């Protein structure tokens, strides 16, 4: 059972020096550092420091690696306002008939009834219209061409006019981010942020892992902006989270069952893969195919149904991702590990280093039964 501090948001705060926020990825992808968490009964003095390339040695023949194959849309649009001046939209989610929820900047100067123009080199200007304010998100409902009804149909427009939306704590602007802020297996468009643990997996590392007899399965969770936003309520006992669109296909369920049958371990790459798998098992009837919005909360006290191990990055203070990782290894332990990582000069957040939580490092009470 979690103690009272586990249900207080302020218990998930920590201080990160600004120079620990990674501004650029390492090359090659698998050369990022890897902090290996010791087994649950061991001391944190046994933390190990490796490279992500070495992670293949931590995996066993028969294991199943589950990755998130979402693709980041070029969802950042620079616009010219009808009244003059420039602005910016971040396209978030469809609202039907070509209408999309967007975050607008400057929001006060994009009001219902305003016309916006998309402009790009070698492209005809394209008109958009602000239809309404969205009170829940503080965003705007914007009319796009009526055939832009989902991520797949919108992607062509975004490819012509948009940019990959890097998180605000990354201040650099480099054309290489269009490729580097995608995983190597990103095939299903719909995210506005990358599933960042997967950014470490190079083609060479994936091939080496496969050669060890480790299977690979793909889930889809379209990462929304809310994933990286701080939680805003101090009392976490009735926490609710934004929903994100998830698909766990029948072949993934079959792969998990086959992994269990052969004595393998189910390893998630990233918190989004965890959320997808656990949501697909949340109905009480075991792991089932799933397609649709998910708002599952994973925090200390949660008993995992599917996931046994996790490769993950270092996350923002007071975020839902920090709660999820705390559910695996405990809040006190996690914050001690983060402090050790800061002292050891690990790089944090989207382009930063990684942490490996093996099945034996997971709290006994959190492990799948």
From Swiss-Prot:
Pathway this chain belongs to: tRNA modification; tRNA-queuosine biosynthesis
Gene Ontology MF, one: S-adenosylmethionine:tRNA ribosyltransferase-isomerase activity
SUPFAM superfamilies the UniProt entry points to: QueA-like
Subcellular location: Cytoplasm
Catalytic activity: 7-aminomethyl-7-carbaguanosine(34) in tRNA + S-adenosyl-L-methionine = epoxyqueuosine(34) in tRNA + adenine + L-methionine + 2 H(+)
GO biological process, one term: queuosine biosynthetic process
Key words, A-Z: Cytoplasm, Queuosine biosynthesis, S-adenosyl-L-methionine, Transferase
Database matches in InterPro entries: QueA (IPR003699), QueA_dom1 (IPR042118), QueA_dom2 (IPR042119), QueA_sf (IPR036100)
Family annotation (Pfam families): Queuosine_synth
E.C. code: 2.4.99.17
UniProt record similarity statement: Belongs to the QueA family.
HAMAP family on file: QueA (MF_00113)
Annotated function: Transfers and isomerizes the ribose moiety from AdoMet to the 7-aminomethyl group of 7-deazaguanine (preQ1-tRNA) to give epoxyqueuosine (oQ-tRNA).
Subunit-structure text: Monomer.
Protein name: S-adenosylmethionine:tRNA ribosyltransferase-isomerase
Organism of derivation: Synechococcus sp. (strain CC9311)
Name of the coding gene: queA
């Amino acid at each position: 059972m979690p103690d009272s501090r586990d249900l207080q948001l302020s218990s998930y705060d920590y201080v990160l020096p600004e120079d620990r926020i990674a501004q650029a990825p390492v090359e090659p992808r698998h050369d990022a550092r890897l902090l290996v968490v010791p087994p649950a009964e061991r001391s944190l003095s046994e933390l190990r420091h490796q490279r992500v390339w070495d992670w293949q040695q931590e995996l066993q023949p028969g294991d199943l690696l589950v990755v998130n194959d979402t693709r980041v849309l070029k969802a950042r649009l620079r616009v010219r306002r009808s009244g003059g001046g420039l602005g910016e939209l971040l396209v978030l989610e469809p609202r039907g008939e070509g209408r999309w929820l967007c975050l607008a900047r400057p929001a006060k100067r994009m009001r219902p009834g305003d016309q916006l123009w998309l402009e790009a080199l070698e492209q005809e200007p394209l008109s958009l219209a602000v239809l309404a304010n969205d009170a829940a998100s503080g965003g705007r409902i914007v009319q796009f061409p009526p055939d832009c009804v989902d991520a797949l149909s919108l992607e062509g427009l975004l490819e012509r006019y948009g940019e990959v939306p890097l998180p605000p704590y990354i201040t650099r602007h480099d054309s290489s981010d269009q490729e580097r802020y995608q995983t190597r297996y990103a095939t299903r468009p719909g995210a506005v942020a990358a599933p960042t643990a997967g950014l470490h997996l190079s083609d060479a590392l994936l091939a080496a892992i496969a050669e060890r007899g480790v299977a690979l399965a793909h889930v889809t969770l379209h990462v929304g902006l809310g994933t990286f936003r701080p939680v805003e309520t101090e009392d976490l006992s009735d926490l609710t989270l934004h929903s994100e669109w998830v698909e766990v296909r029948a072949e993934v369920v079959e792969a998990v069952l086959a992994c269990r049958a052969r004595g393998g371990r189910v390893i998630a790459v990233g918190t989004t893969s965890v959320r997808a798998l656990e949501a697909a098992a949340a109905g009480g009837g075991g792991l089932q195919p799933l397609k649709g919005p998910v708002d599952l909360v994973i925090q200390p006290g949660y008993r995992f149904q599917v996931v046994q191990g996790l490769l993950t990055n270092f996350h923002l203070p007071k975020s839902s991702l920090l709660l999820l990782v705390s559910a695996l290894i405990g809040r006190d332990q996690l914050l001690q590990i983060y402090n050790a990582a800061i002292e050891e000069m690990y790089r944090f957040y989207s382009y930063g280093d990684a942490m490996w939580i093996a099945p034996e490092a997971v709290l006994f009470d959190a492990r799948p039964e």
